[in-house]
């Protein structure tokens, strides 16, 4: 099939789509794909029809930037770690900047924030070695807040959606690929005098391609950064710079890290002991 034939085939698809019902459209798509496979134009048909594979990732690479208005750095030791400086009971507002463009992803963000579900690494009788993991940050932070800290640990969140960028933490879904191959990125703006987080910006890359499970893992990890957590040393922890999607839950180590951070203690390095 020459270029003119391919162009004509594409025009036929577009013309017929407007005239057919959804059922007939699906039948037509399958028929045309069958023809395309025969003549070797299958990839072209897939692109023209906008069929996109939703990718699952075993591990997710992430990056974390700290900006103190003078220096932006990914070196966790270059600038002091910071936390939110809140009045007790304050609410952090999380703005899904382009949530209207990705309505199917909003429930995933809500799950990562509000879920009360807890999972365990043991099945059956609870033993001394049982480890508990949290799906929702609000629930995990309420557990962390049971310990007294110098600063109030955030426990209340409100999700909003505005293209103007309001809110304390913003989340943006991007169809683009990150230049360094990262799927998630968090940049926090800090007041270095008080080690206070002023604003956090989360970007999820390849948002049109990644699966819901991968997206959930990314949001959970990046929100950890937005709360102030650095990358963890343990390869098995949610906060590792390249974390496992299937085990991307909030661990007791992450909760202890929050307690340490909001007690204005050092968290360099962020080590998870006995991680399983």
Cite the ranges covered by each PLM segment.
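Residues that flank catalytic or metal-binding motifs in active/ligand-binding sites
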Residues: 50-52, 90, 167, 198-200, ...
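Active-site recognition of the HExxH zinc-binding catalytic motif
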Residues: 217-231
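Metzincin-family zinc-dependent endopeptidase catalytic domain
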Residues: 106-220
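Post-HExxH zinc-binding segment in Zn-dependent metallohydrolases
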Residues: 241-271
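Second-shell loop/turn segments in exported
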Residues: 94-106, 203-214, 240-248
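Structural recognition of the beta-strand scaffold that forms the well-ordered cores
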Residues: 93-96, 170-173, 200-205, 226, ...
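Disordered inhibitory propeptide/activation segment of secreted metzincin zinc metalloprotease zymogens
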Residues: 4-17, 21-105, 111-123, 179-180, ...
């Amino acid at each position: 099939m020459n270029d003119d034939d391919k162009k004509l085939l594409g025009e036929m698809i577009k013309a017929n789509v407007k005239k057919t019902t959804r059922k007939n459209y699906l039948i037509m798509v399958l028929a045309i794909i069958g023809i395309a496979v025969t003549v070797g134009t299958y990839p072209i048909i897939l692109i023209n029809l906008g069929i996109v594979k939703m990718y699952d990732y075993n591990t997710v690479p992430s990056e974390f930037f700290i900006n103190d208005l003078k220096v932006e750095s990914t070196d966790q030791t270059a600038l002091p770690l910071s936390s939110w400086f809140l009045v007790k009971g304050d609410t952090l507002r999380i703005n899904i900047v382009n949530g209207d463009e990705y309505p199917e992803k909003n429930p995933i963000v809500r799950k990562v924030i509000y879920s009360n579900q807890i999972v365990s690494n043991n099945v059956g009788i609870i033993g001394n070695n049982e480890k508990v993991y949290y799906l929702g940050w609000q629930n995990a932070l309420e557990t962390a807040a049971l310990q007294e800290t110098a600063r109030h640990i955030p426990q209340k969140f409100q999700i909003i959606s505005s293209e103007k960028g309001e809110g304390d933490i913003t989340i943006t879904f991007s169809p683009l690929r990150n230049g360094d191959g990262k799927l998630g990125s968090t940049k926090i703006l800090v007041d270095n005098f008080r080690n206070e987080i002023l604003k956090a910006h989360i970007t999820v890359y390849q948002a049109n391609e990644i699966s819901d499970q991968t997206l959930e893992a990314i949001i959970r990890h990046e929100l950890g950064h937005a709360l102030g957590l650095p990358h963890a040393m343990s390869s098995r922890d949610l906060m590792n710079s390249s974390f496992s999607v299937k085990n991307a839950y909030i661990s007791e180590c992450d909760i202890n890290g929050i307690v340490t951070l909001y007690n204005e203690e050092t968290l360099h390095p962020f080590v998870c002991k006995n991680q399983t």
